[in-house]
Design a protein with these regions (language model features):
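Active-site neighborhoods and metal-handling regions in enzymes and metal-associated proteins
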Residues: 1-354
């Protein structure tokens, strides 16, 4: 698998007239090599596949990185890597710090030209293969199970933080490597903060609760948001919920191969804007998910590009009324040539959990 990915990267290098690419971002390194450790880098060129790590990971790399020449680096690994660059050498400028770039530029052999080439590996990562989709589907199933567990345990009377900790424990007990991000559990007015941090505050009855969470399986993430009810929320909160649900329902089938990313966003945004909430939907409709919970492509008002079959994206409209209430509904989907495949299975009709 890693050999095929490196081969595709070499094709991109030829299109950019690059002789090689220095990859330092650990998720990109993992995608290309299979390495899961915390210190590694690689160089990919037409003639070489070089992987560098330190003493701690030599044995691990022997098992995980069969398709690259493995090199044990010294105390200053980046300088050891830089010495092996040749010709027009691209580097992932989205991730390499100024200090690290300075070190590389001071060390490369004479005649090497360093060329910013960020986004090349991320572009490959954006289109998932069957194995990646399977891992993400498994992760999504775990988060669906965590939502189901709330039907039994309820929400009212428990603190937001208690619920968040319980959701993580459920997913890990069910086989997750861990959460793909710290869960959001936000009740009432706290739900108007899109990335609210769970508080040591009891969740009241007769309110809406925004819960955003995901699991990680084989390094791949899921991401799902549901807004749940305790008791009988007020009518205006229920109307807001139905607005967001309708916006998401209309946007989902628009997420198809060939669709402009900004056009998919527009489907949901037009519905929310028409209801008078233009100022209350301030984030994009969605984002890619994979080895990281936020990656390419992006669905938003100014997003560039079009969707491709195999993209894994979220579709997550939300409306947030400061000091009052928030609603977000999010699914993780796989883009196809027709209707997207929805990985997140918990119901979207308003669920009351007590």
């Amino acid at each position: 698998m890693s050999a095929a990915r490196a081969d595709r990267l070499v094709e991109l290098l030829a299109e950019r007239e690059l002789d090689s690419l220095l990859v330092t971002n650990l998720l990109n390194v993992r995608y290309l090599t299979g390495f899961t450790g915390t210190n590694g880098a690689c160089i990919v060129s037409r003639d070489e596949r070089l992987f560098f790590t330190d003493f701690r990971y030599v044995e691990q790399a022997r098992d995980q990185v069969p398709d690259f020449e493995r090199i044990q680096a010294g105390a200053d690994m980046l300088r050891d890597v830089a010495k092996r660059l040749r010709g027009r050498a691209g580097f992932d400028d989205d991730h390499l710090s100024v200090a690290s770039f300075t070190k590389v530029s001071e060390t490369v052999p004479d005649g090497v030209e360093l060329v910013p080439a960020g986004g090349l590996v991320e572009g490959l990562r954006a289109v998932k293969d069957d194995g990646e989709v399977a891992a993400m589907a498994a992760a999504a199933e775990l988060s669906t199970g965590a939502y189901d567990s709330l039907r039994e345990r309820g929400l009212a009377g428990r603190t937001e933080r208690e619920v968040a900790v319980g959701l993580v424990r459920f997913m890990e007990d069910a086989g997750a490597e861990g959460p793909s991000f710290p869960p959001v559990v936000a009740s009432g007015a706290h739900g108007a903060l899109p990335h609210a941090v769970p508080r040591d505050v009891e969740i009241p009855r007769d309110t809406l609760v925004v819960i955003d969470m995901g699991a990680m399986v084989d390094g791949y993430c899921s991401d799902c948001t549901r807004t749940l009810a305790t008791g009988s929320p007020p009518d205006d909160a229920l109307e807001l919920y139905e607005l967001v649900r309708r916006a998401q329902q209309e946007a989902l089938p628009a997420a198809t191969a060939g669709a402009e990313c900004r056009a998919v966003d527009r489907v949901a945004r037009d519905i929310i804007d028409a209801a008078g909430h233009e100022e209350h939907f301030g984030h994009g409709l969605g984002h890619g998910v994979g080895l990281h919970v936020h990656e390419a492509p992006r669905l938003g008002k100014t997003a560039e590009g079009t969707l491709e079959a195999g993209n894994a994206v979220t579709v997550e409209p939300g409306v947030y009324l400061p000091g009052s209430v928030g609603v977000r509904i999010e699914d993780l989907v796989i883009v196809t040539g027709g209707e997207p495949r929805i990985l997140t299975g918990f119901p979207k009709e308003l669920v009351t959990v007590g």
